[in-house]
Amino acid sequence: MRKLRTAIIGTGFMGKVHAEGIRRLGNVDLVAVASIDDQSAKQFADSVGIPASTGDYRTILNDPSIDAVHILTPNALHYPMVKAALLAGKNVLCEKPFTVTAAEAKELLDLAESKKLVHCLEHNLRYYPVVQQIRRMREAGDLGDILIVQGTYSQDWLLYDTDWNWRLDSKENGALRAMGDIGSHWMDMIQHLTGQKITALCADLQTFHKTRKKPAGSVETFTGKTLQPDQYTEVSIDTDDFGAVLLRMGDRTRGCFTVSQMSAGCKNRFSVE
């Protein structure tokens, strides 16, 4: 059986994570990477040992030898890039969110199914051993009827108004930030564990830092940066720092959870009860 040939589009924080994951599979070759320009693509390729690089992602899509692509770009680019990949006949694994609107997601779903291509998101938290154990226990009936669920997902990497990342900009990220970035993981997890779908919810979202200091240069995800006054611009923020949600699942189950990217001391604190 021949190995699948795959490529990465996007060289930010998740690029190295996906490169490592692909290499651990054993039956997939990571053959190319695309970034915003030739230099950054080449630098990333050299750092992780990928043989080919390009500053134009369409070069990868036009390569008939590549079976699948991982799209790891800012959220607003997911829709055009996934669509282009599907039209080029590539199977797609895309970072969440798939798109920033439901209409775009439905269009891509229909396109992928019409072309009989694999298209998916990866919710990596599903694969922790404890998560798989809880799911097996629920499926075996060991947990009884699940009537109440609750939990949190808290981080602190955007605690200060000097913390910056492209996700703060709704033009790149979409309207939902904390809720879309980490709340989506919590909602996927609770549905995965309980076997029930969320049927209704109401949410209170809050932006605590109405303005932030945007650096003149780029800042990689989860990295801090000390700025001098002449190195930043004060910009308005319209994405959420925090969210509290009440939800209904199935016929009887009820629950609540909170998400935050401004909880001091919480690096990646996830809980489900």
Show which residues each predicted segment covers.
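N-terminal Rossmann-like dinucleotide-binding module
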Residues: 1-48
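NAD(P)-dinucleotide binding in Rossmann-like oxidoreductases
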Residues: 5, 205-206, 226-273
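Glycine-centered tight turns that cap/initiate beta-strands
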Residues: 27, 49, 65, 142-145
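Short active-site oxyanion
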Residues: 28-32, 67-69, 176
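Short, conserved SAM-binding/catalytic segment
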Residues: 43-50, 107, 111-112
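Conserved SAM-binding strand-loop segment of SAM-dependent methyltransferases
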Residues: 50-57
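Beta-strand-loop-alpha-helix segment that lines the small-molecule cofactor/substrate pocket
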Residues: 68-75, 79-126, 141
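Predominantly a Rossmann-like dinucleotide-binding segment in NAD(P)-dependent oxidoreductases
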Residues: 125-234
